[in-house]
Amino acid sequence: MTDVRKVAWEDVRLEELNPLISRRLIYSEAQMLAHVVLKKGAIVPAHDHVNEQFTYILSGALRFWIGEHADAPGDTYTDVHAGEVLVLPSMVRHRAEALEDTLDMDIFNPPRQDWLDGTDSYLRASK
């Protein structure tokens, strides 16, 4: 039988990745839910992963560069604002910048192993 859990976000440890980005994680065997707090100007460097990702903006706004534009950010981007969701399939390269102080909810399937074991150095070294 599966373990059922009820979790309050305020009871989940806030992990500071760098001065501009922090997060809280709740996960199970098959999926991961993350509250990600980004201060204005925070950069999530270009990366990809096997995990499918939904990014739901709860407050603020993120600018995403997708695919070939992730490595050479320019005028081709997608802005995602509060109340909007960006759906990223597996292995789609992407980069993001916080246009303002932002709280987003990321959903991953399967869970991000690099986030669980702390090997997400691309994110920890960003500004």
Regions found by a protein language model. Give the residues of each.
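A short, N-terminal "cap"/entry segment at the start of jelly-roll beta-barrel domains
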Residues: 1-34, 121-127
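Histidine-centered metal-chelating micro-motifs
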Residues: 43-45, 63, 85-95
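Ligand-binding loop in jelly-roll beta-barrel domains
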Residues: 90-114
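Short acidic-glycine-tyrosine-enriched beta hairpin
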Residues: 69-90
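Short histidine-centered beta-strand/loop micro-motifs
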Residues: 17, 24-25, 36-37, 44-49, ...
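Conserved hydrophobic/aromatic beta-strand scaffold that supports enzyme active sites
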Residues: 6, 25, 35-37, 54, ...
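A cytosolic small-molecule/anion-sensing beta-strand core signal
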Residues: 58-59, 81, 100
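Short, conserved beta-strand element in jelly-roll/cupin
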Residues: 37-39, 49-64, 68
